[in-house]
A protein has these predicted regions:
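Bacterial N-terminal signal peptides that target proteins for export
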Residues: 1-10
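A Zn2+-metalloprotease active-site environment signal
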Residues: 2, 22-304
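Bacterial N-terminal signal peptides
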Residues: 10-19
Length: 304
């Protein structure tokens, strides 16, 4: 095939791929090209194979991959924190959290949602990709009722639903991982190649862990998680005002000068509070009393 024809075909197929991002589109084009006698069967197979490899290399992480990255991130977190061993509290959090997850925009993940308490006085909450969520003792101690516990959990579920943790992984790094895993050669990796793949995977995990523990999410991501959390809460009868109440406590501490730890990775608490209040007012969500939830909170919550 002449160079000019290759350039022309490559340009057309490249444009189709950019517009539609689908290897099947390229395969339709090569079938037409072969039928018109413009390309040979061998050339068609080469182009189709290249398109499929390109699609795999730029595809997002699938649910199973997200699950394994999330597990590794959780292990990294547990290398820095101990779990708070209170079976009754953990079961209680999981009951509330599972109900909220079902009301979210992503009710099911590959490995499911799991909630646990970190044995730490600091205020913190960490949502790993795939649905493993940690809440510190210090964070829970500030909750005065089940509605506020639900607000904390709903916010973290929103981060999982939005896949915010995955956004921390450098795109170039993940493209290398996918390319390595997607090749026939991956089945016969040498020791050096396997070491590189492990290093790339660890780098992806470290990208997420660094965002959760050091850098934090952007203000836009935090505010978006708040707004989604309000909707999740409202859908199953929790009072969305509880999130505003909890944010008010955090904003008050931030105004008083708190700027380390959680407050260092979660700036702009006052803006988040204002955004939450605006949505609550717009939706006309009003507080609703649920005495049975207060009784349950008193029964299972050791910090009240």
């Amino acid at each position: 095939m002449s160079k000019s024809i290759w350039v022309a075909i490559g340009s057309v197929f490249g444009l189709l791929f950019i517009l539609f991002g689908c290897a099947e589109v390229i395969q339709v084009g090569t079938t037409v090209g072969q039928g018109m006698g413009q390309i040979s069967k061998e050339d068609k197979e080469k182009i189709d194979r290249l398109a499929l490899q390109t699609e795999k290399a730029i595809r997002p992480m699938n649910e199973q991959e997200e699950y394994y990255v999330g597990r590794a991130v959780a292990a990294t977190i547990l290398g820095q924190y101990r779990l708070y061993r209170n079976e009754k509290l953990t079961r209680y959090l999981n009951e509330v959290g599972q109900a909220l997850a079902l009301s979210s925009s992503r009710p099911f993940t590959y490995g499911g949602y799991h909630f646990a308490v970190l044995d730490a006085d600091e205020v913190n909450a960490l949502a790993c990709p795939g649905g493993i969520i940690f809440i510190s003792r210090g964070m829970l101690k500030k909750a005065q009722n089940e509605e506020e516990v639900a607000a904390i959990l709903a916010h973290e579920i929103a981060h999982v639903s939005h896949k915010d943790g995955l956004g921390a992984i450098q795109s170039a790094r993940w493209a290398e991982v996918v390319t390595a895993l997607g090749t026939e050669a991956a089945r016969k990796l040498s020791g050096a190649d396997l070491a590189k793949l492990v290093s790339l995977f660890e780098g992806s995990v470290n990208d997420v862990a660094k965002t959760l523990l050091v850098n934090g999410y952007s203000r836009e991501q935090e505010s978006a998680a708040d707004l989604s959390a309000l909707s999740y809460m409202n859908r199953i009868g929790y009072d969305p005002n509880a999130l505003a109440d909890y944010l008010e406590k955090l904003a008050r501490e931030q105004r008083a000068g708190a700027n380390k730890g959680f407050f260092g990775t979660h700036p702009g608490m006052q803006d988040r509070l204002s955004n939450a209040k605006s949505l609550i007012a717009e939706k006309k969500w009003t507080p609703a009393g649920h005495p049975e939830r207060n009784r349950r909170f008193q029964q299972f919550f050791p910090f009240s």
